[in-house]
Amino acid sequence: ITATNNLPESYNSEPQRATVGAAWAMLGKAYMAAPEETGLRDFAKADECFKTIINMGRYELLNDYADLYRYDNPNTKESLFELQFNNVYPDCNYWEFDCGSRACDSWFGQGCSFSGYDFLVPTPFAYKTVEEGGIWEDGDLRKEEALRYDFTYYTNKYSEDGTFEYVTPDLSKTQWTGTTDELEPHIKKYEDYRTDILSGLGINNMWNSGKNFSMIRYADVLLLHAECLNELGQTSEAVQIVNNQIRTRAWGGNLPEDKKWNSGMSKDEFRDKVMDERLRELCFEGWRRIDLLRTNKFVELIKERNRWAKESGTIQDFHKRYPIPDTEIKTNDAFGPEDQNPGYSK
């Protein structure tokens, strides 16, 4: 609240600084995510925060979803707050290293802009189509911008005469990992072509990825506004916001009739559908865990949709909280082993 009363709308040439728009967004998110037992969860107050942002007239959706992830297009009119990076150490962010394919690294080296080490990979639910049991609908343009499905690369590494050719990798060079998902769809949003040897910029190293990381986008604000309207009994208006703005852009400006949400849907139906829409719009941007926690779907949907959680069977209710770090317990006089969150070793 203090930030909303004191921060400016802009710092002009200092985009790394949080503005009042970002403060209103975070306050609205706090009202929505507050545990119900605290009495602080308040959709009306949250919606006032989001309407304040909308009425500022400062932010709008980009026409093309793909433009959000261009390395040469940071801090757009859709951005309320971005973490700033560049390709020069120590200001690079290693996202490519985390999200890229180890198979591509083994085949093409670290100068391929989608090489990496598979530390962050999407679940099958997040990359499959609805027909395959996943999230993506036919014609949704966000799918190909969010995820890499094709790992074919233009290289001279495997030609006898040094000519460039298109090479599609397989798993033959990564059998030592004992896994088989190195060429399953990967996160594409943070690939930075500047690091690619083919860019001609001389970086040639996936470690130096430097795209900004978007923390709060106007699309997020609109979806939260719609969610609040639904909770406040204005489901039809909420549907129109999602149809006319979020989904229309996702289909390139012309939303087919069969992709329009029914304005007569129930409040419960909208709750479920808007969570899936948030996944399509904001996947890999850091909000999914909080969304699942605040809607009390964390354990249920991870068990249902997360391949690795299914296989391990480890996800439990106590995982809603992180453990208190052992170093904090040992060095902070205010904590003792008995203060560890339930479910974790004391």
Positions of PLM-derived features:
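Extended, hydrophobic/aromatic-rich amphipathic alpha-helical segments that build helical scaffolds
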Residues: I1-L7, P15-I54, F81, D140, ...
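A glycine-rich, coil/turn loop motif that links secondary-structure elements
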Residues: Y11-A23, L68, N262-G264
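Helix-capping and short linker residues that terminate individual alpha-solenoid repeat units
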Residues: T4-E9, G57-E60, A250-G252
